[in-house]
């Protein structure tokens, strides 16, 4: 048996009827089991929760043994980027679309969740990416991503000219609509849509997936996750703002001549799954792969 939990954090998208229904059911279930339940402040109005048990996500990270996130992968990504800094394990209840990161069904979560809370679960560690923008050699902005960091144009799609370095080794220069640098977790997200490979979550690698490159010879590259990726933006690009998006949530501004450093973050996400979790079953279900023929 693994660690059991007593103080639980409930997180979810506020003002969403489906999410609200599930959060209320979770809160009732957990309190009936005598768990200590903390919630996000923005959810406090819909739960009979004491004021001292309602707090922001940073305080939840400092006080909870386990976080239960209700929503889709997008909400899970937002919570994970913060909670990973506090080494708080996370499990998800799916109220989104695909739900690669949210295992529990909102309709019958009780048995699986009780097993997890009792210490009967699988543990998986997912690393994050740390992205920093340098301008004239000085750091200007930074953020983290669980799925991917994406270099892309602003409001109007156009080609970007940039060079790629792995550590200090020049790899190639390219004109493309952008570049996706993905973790294994993100290999079933944006990188998959751009033609990148599906990577098992346990692999310690990053994937570089160019977006619509203006060449026939360009292919995705898989590299050791302990390497550093540097994207150098050509000063010959049009003098307009480019962006790096972290998980599609946080946007960092990039100018011609800037350098983008992407490396493995110092912290990681601890993701919990029910005991019967199977990664390839998830892929088959979410991606609509055919069933076994014989």
Curated annotation (Swiss-Prot):
InterPro entries to which the protein is assigned, alphabetical: ATP-NAD_kinase_N, ATP-NAD_kinase_PpnK-typ_C, NAD/diacylglycerol_kinase_sf, NADK
* GO BP terms, alphabetized: NAD metabolic process; NADP biosynthetic process
Its EC number is 2.7.1.23
* Protein residues bound to NAD(+): 73-74, 147-148, 158, 175, 177, 188-193
- Subcellular localization(s) per the UniProt record: Cytoplasm
Give the main EC class.
transferase
Keyword annotations of the record? ATP-binding, Cytoplasm, Kinase, NAD, NADP, Nucleotide-binding, Transferase
Query: What Gene Ontology molecular function terms does this protein carry?
Result: ATP binding; metal ion binding; NAD binding; NAD+ kinase activity
What cofactors does this protein use?
Answer: a divalent metal cation
Just give the chief location class.
cytoplasm
Q: Which GO terms describe its cellular component?
A: cytoplasm
Please indicate if the UniProt record lists ATP-binding as a keyword: yes
List the Pfam families hit by this protein, alphabetically.
Answer: NAD_kinase (PF01513), NAD_kinase_C (PF20143)
Active site per the UniProt annotation: 73
Entry's family note:
Belongs to the NAD kinase family.
Purpose:
Involved in the regulation of the intracellular balance of NAD and NADP, and is a key enzyme in the biosynthesis of NADP. Catalyzes specifically the phosphorylation on 2'-hydroxyl of the adenosine moiety of NAD to yield NADP.
- Give the protein name, as stated in the record: NAD kinase
């Amino acid at each position: 048996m693994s660690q059991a939990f007593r103080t639980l954090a409930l997180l979810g998208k506020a003002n969403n009827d489906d999410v609200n229904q599930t959060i209320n059911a979770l809160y009732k279930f957990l309190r009936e089991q005598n768990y200590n339940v903390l919630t996000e402040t923005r959810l406090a109005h819909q739960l009979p929760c004491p004021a001292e048990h309602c707090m922001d996500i940073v305080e939840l990270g400092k006080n909870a043994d386990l976080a239960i996130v209700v929503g889709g992968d997008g909400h899970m990504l937002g919570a994970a980027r913060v909670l990973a800094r506090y080494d708080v394990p996370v499990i998800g209840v799916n109220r989104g679309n695909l739900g690669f990161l949210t295992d529990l069904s909102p309709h019958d979560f009780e048995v699986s969740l009780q097993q997890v809370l009792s210490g009967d679960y699988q543990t998986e560690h997912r690393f994050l990416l740390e992205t920093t923008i340098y301008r004239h050699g000085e750091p200007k902005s930074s953020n983290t991503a669980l799925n991917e960091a994406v270099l892309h144009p602003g409001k109007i799609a156009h080609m970007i000219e940039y060079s790629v370095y792995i550590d200090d080794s020049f790899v190639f220069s390219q004109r493309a609509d952008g570049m996706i640098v993905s973790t294994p977790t993100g290999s079933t997200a944006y990188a998959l849509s751009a033609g990148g490979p599906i990577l098992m979550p346990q692999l310690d690698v990053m994937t570089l997936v160019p977006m619509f490159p203006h060449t026939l010879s360009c292919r995705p590259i898989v590299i050791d996750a302990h390497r550093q990726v540097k994207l150098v933006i050509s000063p010959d690009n049009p003098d307009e703002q480019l962006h790096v998006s972290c998980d599609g949530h946080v946007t960092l501004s990039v100018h011609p001549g800037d350098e983008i450093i992407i490396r493995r973050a110092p912290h990681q996400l601890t993701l919990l799954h029910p005991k019967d979790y199977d990664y390839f079953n998830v892929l088959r279900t979410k991606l609509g792969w055919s069933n076994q023929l014989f």
